[in-house]
Every structure is written in structure tokens, then in C-alpha cells.
Amino acid sequence: MSARVAYLGTSIADWAGELSSRDPLQRRLGAYALGEIGPAATEAASDLAAALQDPIGFVRVWAAAALAGVAPPSGESVTVLIAELGDELAFVRSLAAWHLGRLGPAFRGIEQAILPLRQLAGDEDPSVRVEAALALGMLEGKGAPPPELKSLST
């Protein structure tokens, strides 16, 4: 792996190595950093793909988001993010919705996320409902926040 491209002074190889750390926060940080490097970190795509099987939901979400920015669009990231919309932890569901929205309407396979995001309108956690509504607004090309959020700003 290339030592020339770095994020915060750490090489792609070292960030990819963090994906194997015993500490889930380090694994999440490795995924985040590789995502920040973006397409220049394509050599870490297989490491990120392996991290999609991580036992910790938030690590899978960050790995999927990073893979979407590092590798050519394949739909694999969308599949993982959609699966995480059903995680038992509200912050993982919210984070997955956030990332789905930011992939944008042109991302390959994103149309599969519309129905699951709509189903989150009834989620018991308000942060999940808000992120799902924002993601839908971004993916459906409306630009403005959806009407469901109006009550939160008044």
C-alpha cells in the first residue's frame, strides 16, 4: 500500500491496519480515515470490504461509508447501510440513515434504500426519524428538509 498518501500523517497501510484492531473505536477510526482519503485509498478497498463483516454495527456503518467513497460504486455499501437501519442501537440506525442520504440519488443501488428509510418514520427514537427524513429529502431530490421536520424548528 502506498505510503505517499496519508491522513493526519498516517499512511493508508497503517489506517487499513487499524481495521484489524481489537478496539472497535480504532477500527471505526481506520474506516473513517480511509474514507477521508477517498479514491486515493483504493488499495484499501478489500480491507474495507472485509470490515463490512465486523461484529460491531457502528464499525460496519463507517466501513460501508468509507468503501462507498474509496471504491467504484458497487451497491455493496448500500446493502450494508440498509441492513444497519435495523440495528438494535438507535445511534447505528441514525448513522446508517445519515450516510445513505449523503451517498446521493445517483449512487448505484440507492433506490433500494427509499422504502427502508420511509419505514423509519415510525422509529421510537427521534434522532432516527429525523435522519431518515433528511436522507429521504436528499435521495428524492427535494433539497429542502421534509415537512415532518418543520415541527422541530418552530
Where are these regions (language model features)?
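Amphipathic alpha-helical scaffolding segments comprising HEAT/armadillo-like alpha-solenoid repeats
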Residues: 6-18, 39-53, 72-86, 107-121, ...
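Structural detector for internal amphipathic alpha-helices that build alpha-solenoid repeat scaffolds
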Residues: 1-8, 25-40, 50, 58-73, ...
